[in-house]
């Protein structure tokens, strides 16, 4: 068994090919494995694609930093969800041209100004995934706050 690394310094991932196409099992020290695959004809659609994982990474990065700051502000968060949409280029490399993230929050005391502040902090300082794609992909963030 591998020892857990200090994730603040180094991240180690492993992928293992599971078939004769592009189906991989990926893991990070100490976490459950995930399946990564591509759509036919290259793959069999048996897992997440790399771009889907990027969207999940960006969403969880923004979500983690936003929730951390909202909680430090003593805000109540009853529900929190992020829906992300990536619009792909049609020419190679067929990565994202733009990404839209929508935060859906239920809270009795979070105001738009609070979210504007934590989104700005996430984008400019605290979300490493966003930092890595900045300048390459247009990222927009919308939000919907409900009090019920």
For each predicted feature, which ranges?
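Alpha-helical metal-binding/catalytic segments enriched in His/Glu/Asp
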Residues: 58-62
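Extended beta-strand/beta-hairpin segments
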Residues: 1-56, 67-148
């Amino acid at each position: 068994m591998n020892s857990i690394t200090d994730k603040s310094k180094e991240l180690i991932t492993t992928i293992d090919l599971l078939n004769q196409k592009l189906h991989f099992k990926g893991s990070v020290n100490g976490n459950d494995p995930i399946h990564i695959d591509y759509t036919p004809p290259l793959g069999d659609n048996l897992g997440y694609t790399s771009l889907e994982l990027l969207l999940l990474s960006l969403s969880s990065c923004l979500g983690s930093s936003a929730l951390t700051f909202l909680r430090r502000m003593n805000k109540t968060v009853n529900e929190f969800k992020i829906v992300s949409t990536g619009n792909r280029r049609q020419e190679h490399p067929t990565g994202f041209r733009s990404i839209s993230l929508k935060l859906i929050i239920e809270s009795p005391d979070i105001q738009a100004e609070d979210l504007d502040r934590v989104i700005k902090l996430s984008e400019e300082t605290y979300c490493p995934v966003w930092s890595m794609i900045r300048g390459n992909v247009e990222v927009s963030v919308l939000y919907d706050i409900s009090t019920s």
